[in-house]
Amino acid sequence: MMLRDNYAQGADPSSPGHPARATHVIRDLIVSQNAQETIASYVTDMRALEEHMHKAFAGQITDGKDGKFNSVIRELSGLSEKHIAALDEIADRRKQGGQGIAEAIKGAASSVLGLGAAAIDLVRSEKLPKNLRDDYTAVSLATVGYLMLHTTAEALGDAEVSELALSHLRDYAKAVMTLFHAVPEAVVTFLGEEGFAVDSKVASKVNKTVDKVWY
């Protein structure tokens, strides 16, 4: 009776035993859990995408037909491998709902594949310019994915994931520009190998033109 009378007389709603306070605590817990699940879904999506990309880069390296551009592909493969390890570490440490990264990735794979098979199904033998074009497409997809993850983590107050996503975004932002500048040279090289008379200076000229467009 005394507890009921205190509420009736306007007890402080912020006090630990007040029903309103309990309601707020429960609501905050639910919101926090939903936020964690939202971030976790982005993390597993990016992990699935990185895995597909890494397999593609490995396939191109094994194929060994890209010659002087192999160093670019190896750098991409190294970045992807590093990203996978970092995403695995944070996902396994948090273990959403008792579910580790291996199980979560199974559910994320179909979602990521829906983003566009052409962007990530790169394990095939293609001519060099098309390989680099598809690499560029995949890395660009990963870049915007990390931008979304960084923004989501910032908005929901997850500093750890925010910083991780930003670090990976920086890696791929540089890689995108490296690929962008490699494509003209790859096209000119390919045309020369096909027997066309080409101006070897064109690649450098195109890159300078493109730099003006971007910057």
Task: Describe every region a protein language model picked out.
Residues I39-Q60, A108-V161:
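Acidic/histidine-rich alpha-helical segments that form the ligand environment
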Residues R21-N34, K55, Q60, T189-E193:
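Conserved catalytic-core motifs characterized by acidic clusters
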Residues M53, D135-Y215:
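Preference for long, well-ordered alpha-helical segments
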Residues S15-I26, E89-R133, G195-V206:
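Carboxylate-rich helix-loop segments that flank metal/cofactor sites and access channels
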Residues L3-I26, S41-E51, G107-A108:
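Acidic, low-complexity proline/glycine-rich segments
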Residues A35-M46, D66-A86, L128-D135, E160-Y172:
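Alpha-helical scaffold segments that form or flank carboxylate-/histidine-based iron centers
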Residues G67-S110, A182:
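Conserved alpha-helical segments that form or flank metal/cofactor-binding pockets of metalloenzymes
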